[in-house]
Swiss-Prot record:
Catalysis performed (reactions): L-glutamate = D-glutamate
Family: Belongs to the aspartate/glutamate racemases family.
GO biological process, one term: regulation of cell shape
Function: Provides the (R)-glutamate required for cell wall biosynthesis.
Pathway recorded for this protein: Cell wall biogenesis; peptidoglycan biosynthesis
InterPro entries assigned to the protein according to its UniProt record, in alphabetical order: Asp/Glu/hydantoin_racemase, Asp/Glu_race, Asp/Glu_racemase_AS_2, Glu_race
Chain's gene name: murI
GO molecular function, one term: glutamate racemase activity
Keyword tags: Cell shape, Cell wall biogenesis/degradation, Isomerase, Peptidoglycan synthesis
EC numbers for this chain: 5.1.1.3
Protein name: Glutamate racemase
Length: 272
């Protein structure tokens, strides 16, 4: 358990199973440009969404322990699978460090945005199987109707850089057909990899559907939480994020450039 003193100058730690958390990194950079950011993508063990709960909880503890070595003031769990099945492990491992999970932030935003009261959720097999999104949304309003759909192929498609590809469109059409006749007006991207494929998903879902990106929701939540605890970095300087991966740094570099639209800072290869 951490006992180090929280400082406004300490970094924000973000972790995900792979590149999906870059959607959170990008949103946090936009919302909090003065903050020092630390990112870990567990590219050696992606995807998490097909693993057992025991394995996911083990990975969550190890990922958190890695970030804790850098004494962060806040840890953002940029993985919906971990948020659904192992947020308590992260909180226990982090001790006195602030923790935010993307799942609750996305659920709250969806509950407040829907007008019809019918919400669709797409996510990994583990996230959807946990029923965590349905529970979190209904905690906000138990009258809301939630239709979940597991989309296990989206993560490998995003990891391979198939961002706007015929194969991705074909898979998306099959998955999103689950919402035909459900009359949803809101669709939660319940995995941080999915905003990478947002253009395809949005075009198939149609303009009448409000897309909820949990990355934007969690960035707003992070700003609110740091402000509440007096931990916002007041510096006007901006710094490059410190990036770490557990495998394939060159592939991560290529996908970072493709998605973020900027050159990649140095990437540190770490063993898990």
């Amino acid at each position: 358990m951490s006992q180090h003193k929280l400082s406004s100058c300490s970094p924000i730690g973000i972790f995900d199973s792979g590149i999906g958390g870059l959607t959170v990194l990008k949103a946090v950079q936009a919302a909090l440009p003065s903050e020092r950011l630390l990112y870990f993508g567990d590219t050696a063990r992606v995807p998490y969404g097909t693993k057992s709960q025991v394995t996911i909880r083990k990975y969550a503890r190890e990922d958190t322990e890695l970030l804790m070595k850098h004494q962060p003031k806040l840890i953002i769990v940029a993985c919906n699978t971990v948020s659904a099945l192992a947020l308590d492990v992260v909180e226990q491992t982090a001790g006195d460090i602030l923790v935010i999970g993307v799942l609750k932030a996305g659920a709250e935003l969806a509950a407040h945005r829907t007008k019809s009261g019918r919400i669709g959720v797409i996510g990994t097999q583990a996230t959807i199987g946990s029923n965590a999104y349905s529970c979190a949304i209904r905690e906000e309003n138990d009258a809301l109707e939630v239709t979940p759909k597991a989309c296990p192929l989206f993560v490998p498609l995003a990891e391979e850089g198939f961002i706007d590809h015929p194969a991705t469109r074909l898979v998306a059409e099959e998955y999103l057909s689950a919402f035909t006749g459900k009359e949803i007006d809101t669709l939660v991207l319940g995995c941080t990899h999915y905003p990478i494929l947002r253009k395809v998903i949005e075009s198939i879902a149609g303009p009448q559907i409000t897309i909820i990106d949990s990355a934007e929701a969690v960035a707003s939540k992070a700003k609110e939480l740091l402000s509440k605890h007096g931990l916002l970095n007041q510096s006007s300087a901006t710094t490059l994020p410190h990036l770490m991966v557990s495998d394939l740094p060159q592939k991560f570099r290529e996908l970072y450039r493709l998605f973020m639209g900027t050159e990649l800072p140095d990437v540190e290869l770490v063993g898990m």
